[in-house]
A protein has these predicted regions:
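Short beta-strand scaffold segments in enzyme catalytic cores
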Residues: 17-23, 29-33, 38-42, 151-157
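Glycine/charge-rich, flexible interdomain linkers and switch-proximal surface loops
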Residues: 10-20, 96
Length: 159
């Protein structure tokens, strides 16, 4: 009925979702994100975050109010400032990441980021075997650390 539709629209006015996506091309990948879902670039030499979160704590880190380590434990770490659906004009950020053979890109939600350290991600991906096994290990670590949020991850490697 019309009344039910109006209630659904009203009740979902503050709902939104985060996004991180990548498209591979010959020499690398194009990545986009909105919210606090992230992309990481991983090689045997290390792990680098590609994306920036659209969140209260990321702004606090940028302004020097807290450190990146403090942001991981901050009670407001899940307060995002941009999301798809909530704001019809929400802008996604874009990145171009050149890649060499054997390099990885990890796309993941905050459920993984909040429970698995960058060094754990690096170790599991570089030493974990095939891509499916790496992801299984990361999800196992996240769940064993009490992941309170949903945990989603995608791993790609340049061949």
């Amino acid at each position: 009925s019309r009344r039910q539709r109006q209630m659904c629209i009203r009740d979902s006015a503050n709902m939104g979702t985060t996004l991180v996506a990548a498209v591979a091309y010959e020499n690398g990948a194009v990545i986009t994100n909105v919210g606090d879902s992230r992309a990481y670039y991983i090689t045997e030499a290390g792990i680098t975050r590609i994306t920036k979160d659209h969140s209260l704590v990321e702004t606090m880190v940028d302004h020097g109010d807290i450190t990146a380590d403090e942001a991981r434990r901050h009670p407001g770490r899940n307060l995002i400032t941009r999301a798809l659906g909530r704001d019809t004009n929400a802008a996604c950020d874009g990145y171009i990441r050149p890649m060499e053979q054997g390099d990885f890109i990890l796309l993941c939600t905050d459920g993984l980021v909040n429970t698995v350290t960058d060094q754990e991600m690096l170790f599991e991906i570089v030493h974990g075997g095939d891509l499916d096994t790496c992801l299984d290990r990361l999800l196992h670590i996240s769940k064993s650390q009490g992941a309170p949020d949903n945990v989603t991850a995608v791993l790609m490697q340049k061949l």
